[in-house]
Amino acid sequence: MLNKRVATLLIGTILMGSLAVGCGSSDSSNSNKITISGSTSVGPVVEILGEDFEAKNEGVSIEVQQIGSSAGIKNAIDGTSQIGMASRDLKDEEKAAGLKETQIAIDGIAVITNKNNIVKDLTLEQVKDIYTGKITNWKEVGGNDAPIVVVSREDGSGTRDGFQENVGFESEELTKDAQISDGSGNIKSIVEGNENAIGYISFGYVDENVNALTIDGVELNAENVKNDSYAIARPFLFANKEDVITEQGKNFIDFILSEEGQNVVEENGFISVN
């Protein structure tokens, strides 16, 4: 569940389209400035970690732009940002571009429905069949006689990539009837407002306003993600080039991986790498 700090940041993201302390471009002339861009799932907790790091390191400025995993990785490759945030594994060509990856957290992806939906569990195969258009009515999976409104993330989203990889289908197989939206917050809002909708969001965004379905009878929680019994999970990564990142940028990564930093990760609804 989102805590108050992440919820506040999420509202800002929805209203502004991105959340940034500054302008979000790399500036090698200022060794105390850390520029970060990428995943909208990773961004809110990195903002909070950044605030804590700034408070401990006078003069340090951390800029965060939430622009999607693929865009953030591109920025890390071309040096626009010191660090790219990704909510998916790096692709072979991204690794070949010289990026070093650091896993900072683990995230389960929740399959969500409206609070009034009587379906509480789906098999992984049923989720796949819904998203590929083979199952189109809730009565086919034990629900009411109503059409399923499929909601998915935009192309380039790390959450979408992680979801599709774990569920087992490619982008071209996604049903043509799917509604496409950006950001876990927007997906959650759509599902809240439509009794027949199904969507998927980052674990940290789940709250009492939606149903997080069990998958093959397994609940989404930290223990089940860590022991691999919950089927839909992905890493939160930082990606950087060694010749671009500053010493303070490296120090920030060390802070996130410390016990204090990982406690912040867990306090905000995500799963520690420790």
Annotate each predicted stretch with a short phrase.
Residues 1-10:
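Bacterial N-terminal signal peptides that target proteins for export
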Residues 6, 23-78, 82-274:
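Exported/periplasmic ABC-transporter solute-binding proteins
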Residues 18-22:
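C-terminal motif of bacterial Sec signal peptides marking the signal peptidase cleavage site
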